[in-house]
Amino acid sequence: MKLISWNVNGLRAVVGKGFAEIFASLDADFFCLQETKMQAGQLDLEFEGYQSYWNFAEKKGYSGTAIYTKHTPLSVAYGIGVDEHDHEGRVITLEMPDFYLVTCYSLNSQDGLRRLDYRMTWEDDFRAYLLANKKKKPVIVCGD
């Protein structure tokens, strides 16, 4: 199994810089992207043999995650089930037969640590989400 994780810092920008060629050359089973900074319908980027799953932030040009996979998941979850966090498009979870694959774009505390309190709440809630899934089967986490 080959898994690639990449913070693209704006997917539309890297598409013009050879993204499709890099994607094809890596031939990964799972290709997890963070910080896509896109909204639904902004870019039609499909690859033969892959299914794609997207979690868009409500705020335009902000965060966002995606997973491309050659394997059909048993289920897909968007977010961690906490409304306070799930509007930012930060997490996608694929349930596979033997494991969960979680891609995450964790939030930044920002200049002057403006969001530090929120970041700490996020960390606690994300950890609880991972531990709850871990009770069912192994969890693979990627992202930043």
Language-model segment annotations:
Residues 37, 43-109:
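Structured beta-strand-rich core segments of catalytic domains in phosphoester-bond hydrolases
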Residues 111-115:
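Glycine/threonine-rich flexible loop motifs
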